[in-house]
């Protein structure tokens, strides 16, 4: 907003100084009072995420230790501030906090991402059974969560499963079954779903082809091509440009 850079000052402890202690409160508007949340005896912690559960009006809080290698999901009762441990994971080195998190509207459950398998995957926590189910599995990363169709019990996502140099959209049941590749064309797909997930727009491109825009149904079947950039393709042919190609170089271990 400013034309010139300005100095930003924030508290950061110097060596030997005590870290700031994090406290969490729930403010009850009707009763005009605040309820202290019990974060445990350890005060040298982070609270990287706070979520409000619309299903039971509780508070879900991420608690992360100072070393950032032990993460816990805590449920707080808004009346008394008491906590319940729902989920936890540990790592010898570091835990990356994922930004994707979604409560389901029709059941007491939520979706979140984790790298605990070595890759970014989607997990479902069931609030009734207190069990966590891994929905997506494999040696690839989930790169985008496109939405949840609770009516038909599907999760829509984009991943690098076909190739680390490509992005393809998929859908999978909320029970972890019935995975379907929606757009098999090699390249990069950027999708946007309609309300109700009946259709989606696919913006698709690859190295030697400009962006193509198309409408597909929820199963990935092509409904209509909106723009194929045919004129641009013909124009590019006039310049007789060399074709581009991506290659993978293996190392001694065979990794690429």
Residues of each region from the PLM?
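Short loop/turn segments that connect beta-strands within beta-propeller blades
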Residues: 28-32, 77-81, 126-130, 173-177, ...
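Short flexible coil/turn linkers enriched for glycine and charged/polar residues
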Residues: 67, 116, 163-164, 176, ...
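Conserved beta-propeller blade repeats
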Residues: 9-23, 38-64, 70-75, 85-113, ...
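N-terminal cap/lid segment of alpha/beta-hydrolase-fold proteins
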Residues: 227-256
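Predominantly five- to eight-bladed beta-propeller fold
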Residues: 1-36, 219-234
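Beta-propeller fold detector
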Residues: 35-38, 83-88, 132-137, 180-184, ...
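Structural motif
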Residues: 21-23, 68-75, 118-123, 164-170, ...
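Structured, non-catalytic alpha/beta "coupling" segments that mediate domain-domain communication
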Residues: 70-72, 199-226
């Amino acid at each position: 907003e400013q034309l010139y850079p300005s100095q930003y000052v924030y508290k950061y402890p110097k060596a030997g100084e005590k870290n700031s202690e994090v406290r969490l409160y729930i403010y009850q508007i009707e009763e005009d009072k605040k309820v202290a949340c019990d974060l445990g005896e350890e005060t040298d912690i982070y609270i990287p995420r706070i979520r409000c559960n619309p299903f039971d009006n509780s508070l879900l809080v991420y608690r992360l230790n100072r070393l950032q290698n032990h993460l816990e999901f805590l449920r707080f009762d808004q009346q008394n501030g008491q906590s319940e441990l729902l989920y936890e994971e540990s790592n010898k080195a570091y835990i990356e906090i994922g930004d994707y998190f979604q409560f389901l509207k029709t059941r007491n459950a939520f979706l979140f991402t984790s790298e605990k398998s070595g890759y970014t995957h989607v997990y479902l926590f069931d609030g009734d059974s207190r069990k966590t189910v891994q929905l997506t599995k494999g040696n690839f990363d989930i790169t985008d969560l496109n939405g949840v169709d609770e009516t038909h019990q599907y999760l829509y996502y984009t991943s690098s499963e076909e190739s680390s140099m490509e992005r393809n959209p998929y859908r999978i049941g909320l029970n972890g079954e019935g995975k379907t590749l929606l757009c098999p064309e090699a390249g990069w797909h950027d999708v946007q779903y309609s309300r109700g997930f009946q259709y989606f727009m696919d913006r698709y491109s690859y190295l030697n082809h400009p962006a193509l825009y198309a409408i597909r149904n929820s199963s990935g079947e092509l409904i209509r091509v909106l723009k194929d950039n045919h004129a641009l393709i013909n124009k590019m042919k006039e310049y007789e440009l060399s074709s581009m190609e991506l290659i993978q170089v293996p190392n001694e271990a065979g990794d690429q």
